[in-house]
Amino acid sequence: MQKGYKMQEIIKTIEKIAVKISEELKYADLGYTDHANSTGDTQLKLDVKSDNIITQEFIGVSSVRSLVSEEKEDALDIHKDGEFIIAYDPLDGSSLVDVNFAVGSIFGVYKNELKPSNLVAAIYCIYGPRLEMVVCEDTPKLYRLDRDGSFKFIKDLSLKEKGKLNATGGTQKGWSGAHRDFIKTLFDEGYRLRYSGAMVSDLHQILLKGGGLFSYPATTDAPNGKLRVTFEVLPFAFIYERAGGATTNGENKSLFEINLEKIHQTTPCFFGSKYEINRLLEFYND
């Protein structure tokens, strides 16, 4: 089985997953379970259902060695001779489903070992008025589900040198002085606030609108950030950097310089056009 075929099989599997999760979102129970995930968040029934859909679909893909889910404490080994590890957030923004906001699924495809340098592809699906998917091996590519049930290529995606949108997470009272000053500067420059609380939706908007900044900084109540490196942060860092943008944790030059020590590790994170990231680092390093 050739390398290209293996990756195509993974992508096609994610297409099937996206359609199934999209259908579940229309009709499924929005209630909570009696369980918490690895980071202590109470699991929605939709989180568990989405996780189960992903697991069942990937069990049939022999090139996948193991699955690493935000909803599971440990990796699930499925094919001992597989070469890829799929790390994923089955339903990012699931707490917003009850208000009918767009939510999504995030996938990072790692080769042989779960470390930043081994990430070879990133894919996310966004469940909104339309079902869309962004696939990135080299250049991010946008696909949309068509009437005939297939995903049609729409366009390559790229970021401008400077954007206009600002999506900033975290409770403001917990921000550092440097972050507060930086965000004020962006608004003084005319940036528009665009923040829904779903990472996929906010980063998708910035990517499709050509640029801006998404940030989830360290706060007093979450000094190591809240977003998870393997499932959320690195896949989007992979996409943004290949779209011509930049990423940082506020210290390193790139989010790919993070020392990954555990599956559910979190980090402060910033994604955007090069202008915004460079300006942020000026404030953070002052």
UniProtKB/Swiss-Prot annotation:
EC number: 3.1.3.11
Alphabetic keyword roster: Carbohydrate metabolism, Cytoplasm, Hydrolase, Magnesium, Metal-binding
Pathway note: Carbohydrate biosynthesis; gluconeogenesis
Record flagged with keyword Nucleotide-binding: no
Gene Ontology, cellular component aspect: cytosol
Binding, substrate: 92-95, 195, 226
Coiled coil: none
Cofactors: Mg(2+)
InterPro entries documented for this protein: FBPase_C_dom, FBPase_class-1, FBPase_N, FBPtase, SBPase
Binding site residues for Mg(2+) 1: 70, 89, 91
Main location, first listed in the record: cytoplasm
Reactions that this protein is recorded to catalyse: beta-D-fructose 1,6-bisphosphate + H2O = beta-D-fructose 6-phosphate + phosphate
GO biological process, any: gluconeogenesis
Binding site for Mg(2+) 2: 89, 92, 232
Locations listed in the record: Cytoplasm
Entry's Gene Ontology molecular function annotations: fructose 1,6-bisphosphate 1-phosphatase activity; magnesium ion binding
Free-text comment on the cofactor: Binds 2 magnesium ions per subunit.
Domain of life: Bacteria
Pfam family, one: FBPase
Record has Methyltransferase as a keyword: no
Quaternary structure, from the entry: Homotetramer.
Family: Belongs to the FBPase class 1 family.
Protein name in the entry: Fructose-1,6-bisphosphatase class 1
Species name: Campylobacter fetus subsp. fetus (strain 82-40)
